[in-house]
């Protein structure tokens, strides 16, 4: 595991290291890349954090997301619920978890990319139509959506 981190640290790259516990994160941290470890719980996230890539771990829940967070990639974990989404979030990749719903989108909704495929989603939040790219395949919601008369579907699974 990692030692105490310097107070002035802005970028922490600790991916592919078999880490199970992260130490307290410095308030100056802007980028945290901790994918492909054995982390089950993240510490409190600094408010300056804009990029969080924590996919391929053993995380079951995320802490409160910082107000400045723009990019979140938390795929291939055991997350059942995402915390409230911050105003500045633009990209979320949360595929291959245990999610049953996506939280309400922020009023400012700056989200341009959402990949929530391979979860247990039965519904999508209001305002989803303003997002440029949404990937929601392999969710129970797919059965409801394909019944919409104005929607054109393309099956790309066997091509």
Q: What do the predicted segments below correspond to?
A:
Residues 8, 20, 28, 40, ...:
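Serine residues within intrinsically disordered or low-complexity segments
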Residues 111-159:
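Leucine-rich solenoid repeat scaffolds
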Residues 7-9, 26-30, 46-50, 66-70, ...:
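Short "repeat-start/strand-capping" segments in structured domains, especially the N-termini
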Residues 1-4, 10, 14:
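Low-complexity/repetitive intrinsically disordered segments
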Residues 2-5, 22-25, 42-45, 62-65, ...:
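Canonical leucine-rich repeat
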Residues 11-14, 32-34, 50-54, 72-74, ...:
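Conserved hydrophobic beta-strand positions in leucine-rich repeat
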């Amino acid at each position: 595991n990692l030692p105490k981190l310097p107070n002035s640290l802005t970028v922490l790259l600790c991916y592919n290291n078999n880490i199970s516990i992260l130490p307290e994160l410095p308030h100056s941290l802007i980028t945290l890349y901790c994918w492909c470890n054995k982390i089950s719980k993240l510490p409190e996230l600094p408010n300056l954090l804009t990029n969080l890539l924590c996919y391929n771990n053993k995380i079951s829940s995320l802490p409160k997301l910082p107000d400045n967070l723009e990019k979140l990639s938390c795929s291939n974990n055991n997350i059942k619920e995402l915390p409230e989404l911050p105003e500045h979030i633009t990209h979320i990749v949360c595929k291959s978890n245990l999610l049953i719903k996506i939280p309400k989108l922020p009023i400012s909704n700056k989200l341009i990319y959402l990949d929530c495929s391979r979860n247990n989603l039965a519904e999508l939040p209001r305002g989803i139509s303003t997002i440029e790219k949404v990937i929601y395949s392999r969710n129970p919601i797919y059965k409801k959506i394909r019944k919409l008369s104005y929607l054109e579907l393309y099956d790309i699974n066997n091509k």
